[in-house]
Design a protein with these regions (language model features):
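Amphipathic alpha-helical polymerization modules
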Residues: 1-142, 201-298
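Cysteine-poor, low-complexity segments in flexible/peripheral regions
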Residues: 144-205
Length: 298
């Protein structure tokens, strides 16, 4: 009696082993990476969705970094301006004190010395830098904006420009990152630097002290009005930061829904594939009466 042998048995066995080996590899990759998609062939549609998701995540991360850096930058600027207001309020009080007609020349000279110190403090604050760049020089961030100048009516010279700088914090959304130094400290509606210098000159001449003090008060109000820009920008950044954080969470959840592996299931698949692979080896070796099919395949 003759035995008929399937002429395709060897190709079929090799194909079966290859398929089972692929299942083993796929389960092993899922366990190692925690992901179901480790190469495009695993899930072409899922891979396309992941690429899109990762692109949006990258852009969102960039915007989030911009927001965080800008918050630190604007908080540094606003803190400097707050210190400037404190110094100016002290100068206003000194101006009121200097208006007392009973003061001696020595007393007034002492007040002038204090005001000169405040003037120097204001210049230092106006030259505040963050991350190696100046905050109040307009777009000339590498140029020291202010310097004391005894000849200038304002008592200082300004080497910045009048440009504002905006940064994108989301698609189509930008925020102003600065108020130029001349708009803050040399505003035509009330020059803070000019008013300080004017008060110093008035006290030195013992003339017009009261008017100079009023002028300084007006300049301080104008300065405070310009400072509001920083508060508004910080509020906008806080809101955008919250939105971007929420978006990052949503994108991470979306990525997991597309790609996260069920590790328990992957481990089960690996075990099942291992058993199936070993069974195929043994069964096919028995059919071919070979001690080890792998030896044949080699």
């Amino acid at each position: 009696m003759s035995i008929r042998v399937n002429p395709n048995i060897i190709p079929d066995m090799i194909a079966g082993l290859a398929q089972t080996q692929q299942q083993l590899n796929q389960a092993d990759q899922q366990i190692a990476s925690g992901r179901t998609i480790n190469q495009p062939s695993d899930n072409p549609a899922g891979m396309a969705a992941l690429i899109l998701n990762h692109g949006v995540q990258s852009q969102t991360d960039t915007f989030s970094t911009n927001v965080s850096d800008l918050q630190d930058r604007l908080q540094t600027a606003d803190s400097a301006l707050s210190s400037a207001i404190t110094a100016v309020n002290q100068a206003i009080s000194l101006g009121v004190e200097a208006g007392n007609s009973t003061l001696s020349n020595i007393d007034r000279q002492a007040i002038v010395s204090q005001l000169s110190g405040i003037q120097q403090q204001l210049v230092s604050l106006a030259n505040t830098a963050y991350g190696g760049t100046y905050l109040f020089g307009g777009s000339l961030v590498e140029t020291t904006p202010f310097a004391l100048d005894s000849i200038s009516p304002n008592g200082v010279t300004y080497s910045g420009n009048s440009s504002t700088v905006s940064v994108e914090i989301n698609d189509g959304a930008t925020v102003a990152t600065n108020v130029p130094g001349d708009q803050l400290f040399l505003n035509p509606s009330g020059s803070l630097m000019g008013a300080i210098q004017g008060l110093i000159t008035a006290i030195q001449n013992n003339s017009g002290i009261s008017a100079a003090s009023v002028t300084l008060g007006t300049a301080a109000s104008v300065f405070n009005g310009e400072r509001v820009t920083y508060g508004s920008s910080l509020t906008q950044l806080q809101s955008m930061g919250n939105f971007l954080a929420s978006q990052q969470t949503q994108l991470a959840t979306q990525e997991n829904n597309i790609d996260a592996a069920d590790l328990a299931k992957a481990s089960s698949n690996f075990s099942q594939a291992s058993v199936a692979y070993q069974s195929l080896i043994e069964a096919e070796a028995s059919i071919l009466k070979l001690p080890n099919l792998l030896t044949f395949l080699q």
